């Protein structure tokens, strides 16, 4: 099954999007491995890179390849229709779309020819180590 996931969020409403994604990624029980993901952010001026980074983390913890573009996948505008004037942002989105299609086709061909990468059972650890061993 081909699944494409595109996260989009206005910078000011990032926390709302994050709450939805937290629930979606926590409660969904389908394997997201090798499903292509991409994040797109819109802002008046700044803050795109932090939101973009936060949205992409859902993909990286789910074995999902991330489609990229020529720049961070952001577009700028404050009022309705202003993003249409962001020529660099629109070009970034067009390049992203082409790269996503290419990546999805490449993964499909690779899966057909080579299969999916071997998976491992997830191991959960923490960063605390036994202190006694270190002191000896």
Question: What does each of the following model-derived ranges do?
Answer:
Residues 1-14, 19-73:
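Helix-loop-strand module that forms the ligand-binding subsite of alpha/beta enzymes
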Residues 39-41, 59-61, 78-79, 115-119:
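Short alpha-helical linear motifs
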Residues 48-109:
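Active-site oxyanion/phosphate-handling segment shared across diverse enzymes
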């Amino acid at each position: 099954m081909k699944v494409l996931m595109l996260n989009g969020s206005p910078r000011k409403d990032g926390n709302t999007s994050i709450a939805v994604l937290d629930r979606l990624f926590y409660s969904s029980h389908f394997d997201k491995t090798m499903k292509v993901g991409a994040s797109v952010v819109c802002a008046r001026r700044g803050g795109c890179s932090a939101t973009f980074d936060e949205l992409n983390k859902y993909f990286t913890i789910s074995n999902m390849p991330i489609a990229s573009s020529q720049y961070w996948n952001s577009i700028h505008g404050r009022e309705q229709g202003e993003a249409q004037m962001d020529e660099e942002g629109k070009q970034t989105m067009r390049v992203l779309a082409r790269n996503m299609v290419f990546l999805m086709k490449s993964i499909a061909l690779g899966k057909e020819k080579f299969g999916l990468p071997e998976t491992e059972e997830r191991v959960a650890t923490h960063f605390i180590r036994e202190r006694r061993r270190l002191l000896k």
